[in-house]
Amino acid sequence: MSALPDNLHTFASNDSDSQETREWMDALSAVIASEGPERAHFLLEQLLEHARENSIDMPFSANTGYVNTLEPDQEERCPGNIEIEERLRAYMRWNAMSMVVKANRHNPADGGDLGGHIGSFASLAHMFGAGFNHFWHAENENHGGDLLYIQGHVSPGVYARAFLEGRLTEDQLLNFRQEVDGKGLSSYPHPKLMPEFWQFPTVSMGLGPLMAIYQARFLKYLHARGIANTENRKVWVFCGDGEMDEVESLGAIGLAAREKLDNLIFVINCNLQRLDGPVRGNGKIIQELESEFRGAGWNVLKLIWGSNWDSLIARDKDGALRRIMMETVDGDYQAFKANDGAYVRKHFFGRDPRTLEMVAKLSDDDIWNLRRGGHDPQKVYAAYAAAVKHKGQPTVLLIKTVKGFGMGSSGEGKNTVHQTKKLTDEDIKAFRDRFNIPIPDSELSKLPFYKPAEDTPEMRYLHERRAALGGYLPHRRTKADEHFTVPSLDVFKPITEATAEGREISTTQAYVRFLTQLLRDQSLGKRVVPILVDEARTFGMEGLFRQIGIYNPDGQLYTPVDKDQVMFYKEDKAGQILQEGINEAGGMSSWIAAATSYSTNNRIMIPFYVYYSKFGFQRVGDLAWAAGDMQARGFLLGGTSGRTTLNGEGLQHEDGHSHILAGTIPNCISYDPTFAHEVAVIMQHGLKRMVEKQENVFYYLTLLNENYAMPGLTPGTEEQIIQGMYLLQAAVGEKKMPRVNLLGSGSILRESMAARELLAADWGVAANVWSCPSFNELARNGAEAERWNLMHPTDKPRVSFVAQQLGAHEGPVVASTDYMKSYADQIRAYIPAGRSFKVLGTDGFGRSDFRSKLREHFEINRHYIVVAALKALSEQGVVPVATVAKAIQHYKLSSDKINPLNA
C-alpha cells in the first residue's frame, strides 16, 4: 500500500493512455511477485536513471503515501492479552489524570496550581503499553537493559504505571510536584531528584533526541572496544512532533545513519499539536519528518491509521480515499477529532462522492471510532516488532495520535489541551465512563486512585510481563559494581616537578602529559575516553591519533595523506578517541554518554572533553545543566581560556565568563589553574572522587596556551590547592613596610607575581601572592560557613577558608583574573573585616591583539594591579593618596581611558 506515493492517483485524471499505464503497473506487480522487491527496486532505479539521461526532469521526493508503511499482512501479531492490557491502560490513564487534577486542588492560599499534563500521556498510552509489556528490557544478568528517553510531559503516566507495579505509593502520588519534604514525585524526568527511577532528563525539549543518538553510538563504541557487550540493547527515544522543531532534535540524525545505529529507535508521537496550537496546520508534519529522516538515511515506519481503516483502504481501488488522506492538512485532522462522527463524514469523506459512498453504511459513531494508528495496540506492536528487527539503519516511527485521547469535550484534540490541568465533576465522570473505571459516583468527588487487588488477572499479567523482560522500568543504577584504584600523585611526578631551567610549557601541555600518563595505566587506561571537536592539533594532542586511534565503526577505508608521518591521522574500529568534528553539542553529548556510563552500562568510563573554553558552557549550557541532573562524572577542559590569553582570535573566541557559568551548576567543580602542578593535583583528586569514591560531581578546568616556566609543587599545599587558595610567594621585607595580598588565577596570576616585584622596587610595599585556582570553590566554602552560622547562632562560628588563609597576613586584598570581575568578587563577603578588597577583571567584549595589549586594555596587567594595591592601601590610611596618582603617571596609564566594559 505504501510503496507508491499517493500523488500517483492524482496523475490518473490526466492519464492520456490508461491502458498503457495499467500494463506498466501490471508488469511491475509481476516482477515483485516473481522476483521480489529488490529486483523491482533495481529496475525502477534503472528507469529513473535512463529518464535523467534523456533530460526528463524527475523531481526528488523522499515521501511515500499517507498510509501505513506496513501492510496488514506484513504485521507481526501481538502475543499479549489485548483485553487485559486495555484495562490496565485505562487504570493508568485514570490514575495519571487523578494525580494531575489533585495536584491542582491543593493549598489554594498558596496558589493551588502545581501544574502537570493530562493530554500528552493520553495520546501515547498505547505506545507505552506495547513497550512496557513486550519490548523494553530491564538490566539483569542476561541483558544490559534498554535505555528509555521518555517524553517529559508524560511523567504522570509513568508514575501511574509504577503505582500499579507497587514501586510507588499512594502517598507519593498525592505528593506529585511536591518534593521539598522528600516524599514527592518530580514534575518531569530528573535523575537528580529521583536517582533510582529516572535515567535521562528530557523535558528541555530537543536535548533528549540529541543525547540519545550519542548514547546509542557510545553503546556501539563500548562493544567495539570490548568493554561491554551491548549487542542486544536498544535506545528508545520518545518525543513529540512539535519538539522536532528544536534544532537539536534533528541536528545529529545524519550521524546516526552514517554510523548505522540500528540500536536506536525514535518514536515520534505525531498528535499534530504543540503547546499552543497545530504543529503544521497548513501542512503535514508526518510527511515532512518522513522526508527529513528518509533523506538522512533512516529506516522510516509510518503508522497513521488503525485496523478499522484497513477494509476501507482495501476497497479504495481508484485512489479517491488515498487522495483525500494526502490532501487533508493537519489543521483539519485536528478539527476532526475535536468534533464528532457527523463532522468527519461531512468534512472528510464528503470531499468526494466516492469516499462518501464508502461510509454510507457506517453510523456516525462508527466513523468517530475509526482510530488513528497510535491508538491501535495491534498496529503499535507490529510497528515496534518491525523496528527492533531492522538491521543496518536507525529507525524512526512516525505514529499518528490524538492529543488528549479519551478526554472528550474537556480537551481531546483542542488547542487548549496542553494546559488542561483541572477537570469539572462532569468531565471526571465522563472520563470514568469512557474507560470503565470501577469507581462509584459517590466516590468521584474524591478522585481516588484505582488499583486492582494483587491476585486479579490484570495485576498478575502486569507483573508477569515485566518479569519476562527482566524487571521494572524506568530504573536507574546509582553506582557501578566495579572498583578502581586511582594512581597516586607520585605517578604524575614529571608534571608536578618544576620545569628544567630554560624550559617553558603551557598548562595545556601539562594536561596532555597527565592524560598520556593515565592512558598508560594498566587498569584505568582503557577506560579513558578522549573527546575532541576537531581541535587536537590546537591543543597539541595529535600524538594520540596513532597511539590510541580515532574510533570509526568502518575503520579506515582510505590511506591518510600523512601516513608516512609519526603522528598520522589514524581511524580504527577499536579506536579510543571520539572525534566529533566541528560539533560542540555532539562533543558534549558524547561526554555525557561516557560520564554517565557507570549508571547506564555498569562500566566506569573517564571522559576528557577538551574544547575552546568560550564554546563550552556558553554554547551548550543546557547540556551541561542536563549533565548535572544526570549526575555525570568526568572532566571538561576549556582550552585557550581567558579573555586576554588567546592571541589574535577576538570577540567570539575570548572567554571571560565560563567560570561564572560553571558556578551555576551545583555539582560542577571548576578550577582556573596557573601551573602544571596545580593541574596534576586537581585532576588526580578529581579521579579519586569520581572514579574511586564514585561521587556525583564533574570537573571543569580551564587551560592556557601561554608558555612559561613551572615552579613545581610545594609539598603540603595539595589540600589548599583543592580548596582553592594557597600562598605562592610570601611577602619579603622589613616589618614596617606596608603589606598587601595579591590574589590571582590562570594567566593573570603571573601578572600579580610581576606586580609584587614592582610594588617592592618602586613603592616599598611588600606583597603576598596567593594562587587561587578556584574562586568558585572559595565562594561555595564561604557560603556554606555563613549558612551554618546563620542556623547555629549559639555555636562557635565557622570561618571561611578565605578568612583562614588571609587571617595571619595583614593588609588589603587585590584579586585579579582573566575573567569578569564578578568571578573573583564572589569572595568579597569572606575577606577579613576591615580589609579593603579590590577586584580587577575583564568585563566587556574581547578583541584581537597581543596579550600585552589586551591586558592593558582590560586594565588587568601588572601596572593596574600595582595601582589597585596602592589605592587599597591609601583607603586604609597606610600610603598617601598622592602615591596612587604618582603610580598612574609613572606607568603612563590614562585616567580618562574608556571603560573596557563599554569599549
For each predicted feature, which ranges?
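N-terminal amphipathic, basic-rich helices that act as targeting or association modules
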Residues: 2-165, 431, 505-521, 525, ...
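Glycine- and acidic
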Residues: 10, 27-30, 77-85, 104-116, ...
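Non-catalytic terminal/interface segments that mediate subunit docking, oligomerization
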Residues: 75-96, 100, 107, 121, ...
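Cofactor-binding active-site loop characterized by glycine-rich and histidine/acidic residues
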Residues: 79-92, 96-110, 117-259, 282-283, ...
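Short alpha-helical segments and helix-capping/turn motifs at coil-helix boundaries
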Residues: 110-114, 126-135, 141-145, 196-200, ...
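Residue-level marker for buried hydrophobic side chains located in beta-strands
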Residues: 237-238, 266, 531, 637, ...
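A structural-propensity feature for long, helix-poor, extended segments
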Residues: 237-240, 244, 622-643, 648
